[in-house]
Amino acid sequence: LYLMVILEGLEIGQLKNTLKEFAFHKRECDKVISFKTDIPKLIPHLETAASPSHIYKILFPLSYEAVVLVLLEADSPELKAKVKDYLQHYSRVQIHLKGEDLKGLGIVPGPRFQEILKCLLYARLDGKFKDREGELDYLKEIL
């Protein structure tokens, strides 16, 4: 995180040279370069994100450090609020149903499991239900 903040002002070429010169590990180099190249592309999507699930989909693939940097880079109070909501609330939301529950409902195990569980998570983030019973009702409704 500190490294990304310190090197944030460099252009991409300068950044790569600096990282190479100081012999940082590939993992750190990749994180810093990813921040420099990917985060600016995410900001417009995040600005237009209206629902908690949309905000989650945008920020979830990022490392914690990158999300914090998005917060630091955010210009508007609305964007800062979205990132804070993700860090404080959305990133901690979990669903109650698991694969075994899906099997119990007669759903055949496979790639569809992950899709169904993601759909449940997104619906939970958007406040469509709050408990296990709500998840079951919602699942029966969408299947």
Residue ranges and their predicted role:
Residues 1-143:
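C-terminal subdomains that position terminal phosphate/3'-OH groups for nucleotidyl transfer/ligation
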